Structure formats: C-alpha cells, structure tokens
C-alpha cells in the first residue's frame, strides 16, 4: 500500500505548488499589465 501512502502526499504537494504559483503568476501579470497600460 505504498502507492496509497505516497499519492496523498503528492496531491497535497501538487495543490500547494499550484495554489501558490497560479495566484503569483496572475498577480505579477496584472501588475506588469498595469505598468504597461499607464505608460
């Protein structure tokens, strides 16, 4: 049952990475867009 024990850890890690990466990329993208539009 090593797969059942490894799968939740991989899922939590995947959710944590995407949960931090997606808002960060969207935040940086919106800031760069605001800077570009102002100029």
From Swiss-Prot:
Q: Where in the cell is it found?
A: Plastid, Chloroplast thylakoid membrane
Co-factor(s): heme b
Q: Which UniProt keywords apply?
A: Chloroplast, Electron transport, Heme, Iron, Membrane, Metal-binding, Photosynthesis, Photosystem II, Plastid, Thylakoid, Transmembrane, Transmembrane helix, Transport
| Subunit description | Heterodimer of an alpha subunit and a beta subunit. PSII is composed of 1 copy each of membrane proteins PsbA, PsbB, PsbC, PsbD, PsbE, PsbF, PsbH, PsbI, PsbJ, PsbK, PsbL, PsbM, PsbT, PsbX, PsbY, PsbZ, Psb30/Ycf12, at least 3 peripheral proteins of the oxygen-evolving complex and a large number of cofactors. It forms dimeric complexes.
Q: What does this protein do?
A: This b-type cytochrome is tightly associated with the reaction center of photosystem II (PSII). PSII is a light-driven water:plastoquinone oxidoreductase that uses light energy to abstract electrons from H(2)O, generating O(2) and a proton gradient subsequently used for ATP formation. It consists of a core antenna complex that captures photons, and an electron transfer chain that converts photonic excitation into a charge separation.
List the InterPro entries. PSII_cyt_b559_bsu, PSII_cyt_b559_CS, PSII_cyt_b559_N
Post-translational modification, briefly? The N-terminus is blocked.
**Protein known as:** Cytochrome b559 subunit beta
GO function terms (MF aspect):
electron transfer activity; heme binding; iron ion binding
Q: How does it sit in the membrane?
A: Single-pass membrane protein
Q: Which GO terms describe its cellular component?
A: chloroplast thylakoid membrane; photosystem II reaction center
- The primary location reported for this protein is plastid
Which top-rank group of organisms is this from? Eukaryota
The family note in this entry says: Belongs to the PsbE/PsbF family.
**Which terms under GO biological process does the entry name?**
photosynthetic electron transport chain
Positions of transmembrane segments: 14-30
The record ties this protein, via HAMAP family, to: PSII_PsbF
Free-text cofactor note: With its partner (PsbE) binds heme. PSII binds additional chlorophylls, carotenoids and specific lipids.
Residues given in the record as heme binding sites: 18
One matching Pfam family: Cytochrom_B559
């Amino acid at each position: 049952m090593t797969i059942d024990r490894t799968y939740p850890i991989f899922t939590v890690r995947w959710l944590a990475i995407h949960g931090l990466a997606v808002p960060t990329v969207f935040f940086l993208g919106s800031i760069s867009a605001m800077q570009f539009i102002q100029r």
